Amino acid sequence: MKRMRTLGLAALTVLMLLPAAGEARQGKETPSPEWVTALPAAAKTEQLVVVGGVGQTTAWISMHQKDKNGTWHQIMTTPGFIGKAGLGKTKEGDAKSPVGAFRFNKAFGIAGDPGCALPYTKVDNNIYWSGDQRPGMQYDRMVDIRKYPDLDKENSEHIVDYKEHYQYCLNINYNTLHTPGLGSALFMHCFGPNKPFTGGCIAVPKDKMLFVMKHVNPECLIVIDSLENLGGKL
């Protein structure tokens, strides 16, 4: 575990030193890289979050916006973390981040609404994200424990327990049918303490997550794969 942490932090340091992934170019008119504009998802939306895996648990993450003239602009870049076991999620608990193009279908957090264009839920002590695979227990959905007092808490996430990670969150609509066992609680969220990986989520620094929350729109697509498979380069 110690060796994995050291390797992960080393990879993150390298990403931070790279010109394309170091300082976020928030608010500046920086053209999006050609490989981003060539992604199939770019033809389906006017806003993208791109997660390009670099190494097993680190990623180059960027946000892009198409203007009224059809020109793509890169509005945010940052290094970040993906699942402890890398990419290619297939089941609950495999510690992998999903591969593909997905929408964000829910915005929430421990902090108050930062002005998100998606409906935002400020969570309290009653809120869990269900990992309960039994019928009727709202697998892979936000639930109020008062309505589901028999929820399997051990396999669900009590949102407020993740004080740093879940200040701001966007749910990645990976398991669209809420199929039990396929995977749950796959979010884009803030960095947590110490660990250079996630359980399958996408993690970025808190200030970058706040930027995403303030700029994301309902039609945004998040594209996740290795940087190589995306045709990208740093």
Name the predicted role of every residue range.
Residues 1, 14, 33-36:
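Intrinsically disordered, low-complexity regions
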Residues 1-11:
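Bacterial N-terminal signal peptides that target proteins for export
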Residues 20-26:
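Sec-dependent signal peptide cleavage junction
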Residues 26-198, 207-234:
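Cell wall/extracellular polymer interaction/catalysis modules
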Residues 201:
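Short cysteine clusters
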Residues 204:
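A conserved hydrophobic position in a structured secondary element of the catalytic/binding core
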